Every structure is written in C-alpha cells, then in structure tokens.
Amino acid sequence: PTSPAASPRRGDGPPHGAPSPDLDRRANYGIRRVEVQPGNIGYIDLRQFADFEFGKPDQPARKAIEAALDLVAGTDALIIDLRNNGGGSPAMVGYLSSAFTPKGADIYNTFHYRQGTASEAPADWYAKPRLQTPLYLLVSARTGSAAEAFAYTLKNAKRAVIVGEASAGAANPGGQVDAGNGFGVFVSSGSPLSPITHTNWEGDGVQPDVAATPATAPNVAKALALETVLKQTQPANAALDSRWALEALRAETTPPKPVAFGDYVGSYGALVIGQDGTSLYLQRGRRPAALLTSLGDDLFTLTGEPGTRIHFERDPKGAVSAFETRGSDGSSSHYRRGG
C-alpha cells in the first residue's frame, strides 16, 4: 500500500503543530527574500517548505514559490539559501526539486512506514524547469528535515552544489510520545530512502561539496557561481559584468593593501570624493553617498554595485587630477579635479 503523503519530520514547523494559513501567509510561505544580485546571480532565502495540495494550482504556497522562481528566471545562476530552514512539506520538496530536474527523473526519496510507502515525487511537475542553470544550495547545522531532503535529492542527482556545513541529520519522520512526568520521547515512524544512494542523511546530515561557515557560505557560493558563469559563452558586456562582480566580491572579502584615501579626496566638478573614517565615498549634491571599494592601482568600484568602476588619473607629478567612471555596459564619463 502507498500512504497519501509523507509524514511531518523532526524540525518541520512549530512545536505545537502545523502553521495556520494566516501564519503561513504572514511568513510569506517561507520565502524571506528574493533578489537578483550583482553579476546576474539569483538568490532565494527560503526559511520553510510550505505545504500545499497537488491538483490545486491556485494554492497560495504554490503560487508564492512560482512567483519567486519567475523573478529569478532570467539569471545566469541561482543560489537557494537553506541555512535557516528547519523543514516543512514533502510536497514542496518534490515540486521545487522538479523546477531543476527532468520530468519523471528517478531521484526522489521514498518514505517507508509500517503501513506503506510514500514518494516525494510531485503529482504536478513544475512547468518550466531550468535544467542547465548552475544551482547552489546553502546549508548549515540549522538546515533540517524537508530542507535536507531537498538538498540531498539535488546533490545526489548531481544537479546542485552544496555549500556550507553538514546539515542537522534529521531524516526520519515521527513525533513526540508522552513518556510521563512531563517528559516526551521522539519516536520515528518511518525512514526515507534515496533511489540513488539507497540510504538517507539520518544522523550524518547532508554533507557539503564545498565547506564554508554559515557566515561565509553566501560569498563562497557567489564566487563559485560567477566563476562557473565566466566559463560559459556570454555576450561581451555580460561577461564583463560577471567578471567585475567577481573581482569586486574578492576585493570586499579580501581587501587589498591600505590605500592613501587623502590622495583622492576633493571636488571633481559636480561630484565630491570624501572620506568618512576608513571609507571613501562618492557623492553628487544632496544625493546619498555611495561607498567605494578599492581594487588597487587607483581603481575602485561602487560598493554593492560592481557594474560601475572609478579610475583615478594622476598628473606627471603623481597627484590625482581626474577620474573616469566606467560601466560594464560600455558607458563612461570623465571628471576633472576642481573643474
């Protein structure tokens, strides 16, 4: 016999049962943040695998994850952040996995219970799977249960690179049983098995392909994504944008040698280069100042906006006399000091 759905697992949902529809809505169905990061890298911060029923395409959780995927559909690579995801619904595990794998692929875990089995393979398949997009999953010791199932499935299907540390190791479904005197005991009701590994991640967790601390994992994954994208064939401007994003990321994480900011401070026509403590910034009139990150050799990038660079020019005596702004789209402007 086959049970209709996999049971909740350790780490799935709040301690007193499944979230209410209103709590799910307020939590945006686990989707904390979706954005396109520098270098055209997609990023989804997913905190929960929200539940929904197959056969009902208008259910809010399903529409929410589809909207998130649509927002990053044009990106060159995608990072899904599971570092703070404790789990959730097997239905979402299967559906989201199908967004990156071929329809009907034999990759999904099957849960074995005393009363039967249940597969995480989705009853409805994602309509527009991205089969070639480089995919990176961030995991930590907080990553549990359904989030681990998702990472385990895509790792063993060789469809995603796992970045971070070993996950929680909570594979087996079950629940708390009253042991009396105010004590409870977790009792497993079954166990998942992968058709690829013929085992699961219970106790050991999902092991990373690339080790990183929870704090450094996002930048490690971004660098891996940009390096992969740069190996692919791209239009010239897109390749330049990716390369500048990677160089800026490296500069922000491993700053170059100390820079004499005083050399650059001053007015350049309508623009001002100023110094605030150990930071250099660019400002036009009353507009918010933009911080600059040094790339070395009189070259800077706008912090957080690596598609714009500033190159300072020096006169024959070595004094800074002007700067040029350059865009990865080919645009440029020139500003003389005091002009």
Where are these regions (language model features)?
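Extended, small/polar residue-biased N-terminal targeting/export presequences
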Residues: 1-41, 241
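Low-complexity, Gly/Ser/Thr/Pro-rich intrinsically disordered linker/tail segments
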Residues: 199-202, 206-245
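STAS-typified acidic loop motif
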Residues: 28, 32-62
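Short acidic catalytic loops
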Residues: 44-45, 74-86
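Terminal peptide-recognition signature
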Residues: 44, 80, 135, 154, ...
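A short, well-ordered alpha-helical element
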Residues: 54-76
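Peripheral terminal and inter-domain segments
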Residues: 234-339
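Gly/Ser/Thr-rich loop/hinge elements
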Residues: 87-138, 142, 172-178, 189-195, ...
